[in-house]
Design a protein with these regions (language model features):
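Helix-rich interaction surfaces within compact, conserved domain-sized segments
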Residues: 72-123
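Feature captures the catalytic cores and cofactor-binding loops of soluble hydro-lyases/lyases
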Residues: 47-82
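Short, solvent-exposed amphipathic alpha-helical segments in soluble enzyme
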Residues: 38, 56-61, 105-106
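Solvent-exposed alpha-helical segments within well-ordered globular domains of core cellular machineries
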Residues: 11, 31, 53-57, 79, ...
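Short active-site oxyanion
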Residues: 19-20, 38-40, 63-67, 86-87
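N-terminal first-folded block
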Residues: 8-43
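Catalytic cores of RNA-modifying enzymes
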Residues: 1-17, 105-108
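Short beta->alpha linker loops
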Residues: 27-28, 47, 72, 95
Length: 124
């Protein structure tokens, strides 16, 4: 079941990237945050704490109730986007973000959610 949920989530992420609704990379995510509220922040579970904190706290400074998905590894995120690894991503607010968040919540029922330990103020 977990594998199917992961495939569903990575499929949505790939579709979102093709539609132009997803931004990848630290600098691009930082720039996108300064322009518009994100639908969902993507952070690799095995990414460095420093970069993850910078992205999260910038988002929190600009917007309230920022949502983050952190249960996927950099390799799993990379598979979704046709890359070797992805550490930082942002799903722009809209239908893809809502569908991605729902798919992530379903997957999170089978996996640990490390973002809850990274940032205690994250929605549970």
């Amino acid at each position: 079941v977990e594998t199917l949920l992961l495939q569903r989530l990575t499929g949505l992420l790939g579709m979102g990237k093709k539609a132009g609704d997803i931004v990848l990379g630290f600098d691009q995510v930082r720039d996108a945050l300064q322009k518009k509220r994100p639908g969902l922040l993507l952070e690799a579970a095995d990414g460095a704490e420093d970069g993850r904190s910078k992205v999260y706290f910038l988002a929190k400074a600009l917007y309230s109730n920022v949502k983050m998905a952190g249960a996927l590894s950099s390799e799993e995120l990379g598979v979704a986007f046709g890359r070797e690894r992805v550490i930082h991503g942002l799903v722009r607010k809209g239908p893809i973000a809502k569908a991605t968040e729902l798919a992530y919540q379903r997957l999170a029922g089978f996996r640990a959610r490390p973002e809850l330990d990274w940032f205690p103020d994250q929605d549970r």
